[in-house]
Amino acid sequence: MRKIIHVDMDCFFAAVEMRDNPALRDIPIAIGGSRERRGVISTANYPARKFGVRSAMPTGMALKLCPHLTLLPGRFDAYKEASNHIREIFSRYTSRIEPLSLDEAYLDVTDSVHCHGSATLIAQEIRQTIFNELQLTASAGVAPVKFLAKIASDMNKPNGQFVITPAEVPAFLQTLPLEKIPGVGKVSAAKLEAMGLRTCGDVQKCDLVILLKRFGKFGRILWERSQGIDERDVNSERLRKSVGVERTMAEDIHHWSECEAIIERLYPELERRLAKVKPDLLIARQGVKLKFDDFQQTTQEHVWPRLNKADLIATARKTWDERRGGRGVRLVGLHVTLLDPQMERQLVLGL
């Protein structure tokens, strides 16, 4: 049985700012773009969250909820430095590390000899070491599979951890709401509830054929997760090849103005996700995806070295006009393909 730890730093960007400037510790702060530039919140500290300020929220809305919010532009060099230090701490316990972003990672400690092989004690020690060396807090989840470790890391935030032992998995899944499973959004959750499926226990009683017919390949993933099955390895060589964001509408849209409005809402989230993965990364291409009411989908990409909203909107409009054919649109997505690190290195060396 595997021993997987998911470590998630607590409001990471904001925590670095509060550590480096103690005057910020007890006041609402957020990292994000300005209201004038239609920016979006990247991270908010817990005092700000008490006012309802959340990640991916438009800055203007955040300032309405919390007029005295202190808005910071972000210091990504400082965040990267802290992230690299945290990664080095992880490496003291295992070489099997899969970073998901600057502030979270999976660790496979199945074969680790530290702490007598106890994943629970390893997680506690890692969190304490991070605090001792960086004055930052982390939350952790421990479980025999990746998706449960990720869910567990959110159970006792901030600065806590939650353990799901192999023996506890069946009971934990029985009452686990389906929206806790990564990949189940509001639209999927609503469709599942319409089928009478609210928990993993409900899905366990459902015929796999029905799920496949209703949700395609995601139906199988949903069924497997509800059984506690997740065979994905912690991949130390994992390379993030793309970053994307998409929205499935509750009802199909038929007018370009509706599509453009969705892109306007998606774009700040794409910016936020890209910054979280690697703020200074060059991109190779950016593109759009439309999925139609007959479940056919089309993707259009352009070579573009930096994220550009105007180009994405123009690409989406061209795709809408040329490929929709009168069909309703049920999903709109934006994505960027990241530059191969070796190519990026060559470009840097060539300057």
Curated annotation (Swiss-Prot):
InterPro entries for this protein: DNA/RNA_pol_sf, DNA_pol_Y-fam_lit_finger_sf, DNA_pol_Y-fam_little_finger, DNA_polymerase-Y, DNApol_IV, IMS_HHH_1, Rev_trsase/Diguanyl_cyclase, UmuC
Entry annotation: catalytic residues: 104
GO molecular function: damaged DNA binding; DNA-directed DNA polymerase activity; magnesium ion binding
Reactions it catalyzes: DNA(n) + a 2'-deoxyribonucleoside 5'-triphosphate = DNA(n+1) + diphosphate
Subcellular localization(s) per the UniProt record: Cytoplasm
Binding positions (Mg(2+)): 8, 103
Transmembrane segments: none
E.C. designation(s): 2.7.7.7
Keywords: Cytoplasm, DNA damage, DNA repair, DNA replication, DNA-binding, DNA-directed DNA polymerase, Magnesium, Metal-binding, Mutator protein, Nucleotidyltransferase, Transferase
NCBIfam families on file: PRK02406.1
Quaternary structure note: Monomer.
Record's protein name: DNA polymerase IV
Organism expressing this protein natively: Shigella flexneri
Higher taxonomy: Bacteria, Pseudomonadati, Pseudomonadota, Gammaproteobacteria, Enterobacterales
